[in-house]
UniProtKB/Swiss-Prot annotation:
Component of the adaptor complexes which link clathrin to receptors in coated vesicles. Clathrin-associated protein complexes are believed to interact with the cytoplasmic tails of membrane proteins, leading to their selection and concentration. This is AP-2 complex subunit sigma. It comes from the Eukaryota. PANTHER family: ADAPTOR COMPLEXES SMALL SUBUNIT FAMILY. One of its GO terms (cellular component) is prospore membrane. GO terms for biological process: endocytosis; intracellular protein transport; vesicle-mediated transport. It comes from Saccharomyces cerevisiae (strain ATCC 204508 / S288c). Adaptor protein complex 2 (AP-2) is a heterotetramer composed of two large adaptins (alpha-type subunit APL3 and beta-type subunit APL1), a medium chain (mu-type subunit APM4) and a small adaptin (sigma-type subunit APS2). Interacts with APL1. It is found in: Cell membrane; Membrane, Coated pit. Present with 1390 molecules/cell in log phase SD medium. The gene is APS2. It is a peripheral membrane protein.
Length: 147
């Protein structure tokens, strides 16, 4: 499996989005412990002088990017190619930005169901499904009109 989980949290560690594609989803306590550990690991890093890739466990590495006050994190297999996932984090944020018109944390909080809809269009079962921003926005506008 490629993507094991996708997280989004703010500088204070408040989780705004979480989607598990592996065994963490079945154990809430294990999920909470993993999120706390990920937050401590990422928030303590010097983002100007350290890379966006961190080894997390024996089988998982974290790929993250900070946008304003939000961290977007993907947990991927240890042997996967980091830049590809970093580009997909950026694509996800670009699609959010285009869909909401200059997205902010409050958009994610109050429209979380739309954000999960966007995530579902991009990732299915931990695999990347769509890489075209235009195609994603076209599909999302159709789905949004159904609302």
């Amino acid at each position: 499996m490629a993507v094991q989980f996708i997280l989004c949290f703010n500088k204070q560690g408040v989780v705004r989005l979480v989607r598990w594609f592996d065994v963490h989803s079945s154990d809430p306590q294990r999920s909470q412990d993993a999120i706390a550990q990920i937050y401590r690991l990422i928030s303590s890093r010097d983002h100007k002088h350290q890379s966006n890739f961190v080894e997390f466990s024996d089988s998982t590495k974290l790929i993250y990017r900070r946008y304003a006050g939000l961290y977007f994190v993907m947990g991927v297999d240890l042997l996967d190619d980091e830049p590809i996932y970093l580009c997909h984090i950026h694509l996800f944020v670009e699609v959010l930005d285009a869909f909401f018109g200059n997205v902010c944390e409050l958009d994610i909080v109050f429209n979380f169901y739309k954000v999960y809809m966007i995530m579902d269009e991009m990732f299915i079962g931990g695999e990347i499904q769509e890489i075209s921003k235009d195609m994603l926005l076209e599909r999302l506008s159709i789905l949004d009109r159904l609302d």
